[in-house]
Regions:
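Metal-dependent phosphoesterase core characteristic of DEDDh/y 3'-5' exonuclease domains
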Residues: 11-116, 120-142, 154-160
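C-terminal accessory extensions appended to soluble enzyme cores
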Residues: 143-177
Length: 177
C-alpha cells in the first residue's frame, strides 16, 4: 500500500534494474492478493490523458525506467546483471550477497540481512542511474559530482554497518565519489 500511496501522492519516476521482470510483477501480485487499489499506477489514459503516452506500465514510457531493459536496447540477449554493471563502474555491487539467497535468509529469519541487501541494491541502482543520466546528457559533470557528493554525505551520516561498508568499498573502488 505504501508503494502505491507514494505514487498517488508524488507521481514519481520509478527507477529499477529488472523492475519489469521481477520487482513490479511481485508487487502486482501482492497488491492483487491483498486487494490494494492503485488507480494512478494502473492509469493508461482512460481518466487522465497525461498518462496515455507516458504511464508506469508501458515498457517504452518514461514513468518507469528499467535500466537493465533500456541499456540492453530491450534485447534479452543483451541483458547484464546489476552486479556486472556496478562493478564495471567501480561500485561495490552485491557485496557478497545474492538474490538467490533471499529465500534461504527469509526462512532463517535473517530479515535485517535481506533489508541490507535490498538497500545496497538501491544504492547501486541509483548510482548506475546517475551514470545513465550523464550518458544521456541530462546531468553534466558538475551535477553528476554534486549528486554523488550528496549520497556520500548521506552515507557518512548513516549509522548502519552495511551502508558504511558500501561507502568504504565505493570510495576504495575506481568509481570514486
Amino acid at each position: 500500500e505504501r508503494f502505491f500511496d507514494g505514487i498517488e501522492k508524488f507521481k514519481p519516476v520509478l527507477i529499477s534494474w529488472n523492475g519489469n521482470g521481477f520487482d513490479l510483477p511481485v508487487i502486482h501480485y501482492r497488491a492483487l492478493r491483498h486487494g490494494v487499489a492503485a488507480p494512478l499506477y494502473w492509469e493508461s489514459g482512460e481518466n487522465d490523458r497525461e498518462f496515455k503516452f507516458n504511464n508506469y506500465l508501458n515498457r517504452y514510457h518514461a514513468r518507469h525506467l528499467d535500466l537493465m531493459d533500456i541499456l540492453a536496447g530491450y534485447q534479452a540477449r543483451a541483458f547484464s546483471s546489476l552486479e556486472e554493471v556496478a562493478l564495471m563502474l567501480g561500485l561495490p555491487g552485491k557485496m557478497g550477497m545474492s538474490g538467490a539467497r533471499v529465500w534461504e535468509y527469509f526462512r532463517e529469519g535473517q530479515i535485517s540481512d535481506i533489508r541490507a541487501y535490498c538497500e545496497t541494491d538501491v544504492l547501486n541502482t541509483y548510482l548506475v542511474y546517475l551514470h545513465f543520466e550523464k550518458m544521456r546528457g541530462l546531468l553534466n559533470e558538475a551535477a553528476f559530482s554534486t549528486e554523488k557528493h550528496r549520497l556520500v554525505e548521506f552515507l557518512k551520516a548513516a549509522d548502519q554497518g552495511h551502508l558504511q561498508e558500501f561507502l568504504s568499498q565505493w570510495l576504495d573502488g575506481t568509481g570514486s565519489a
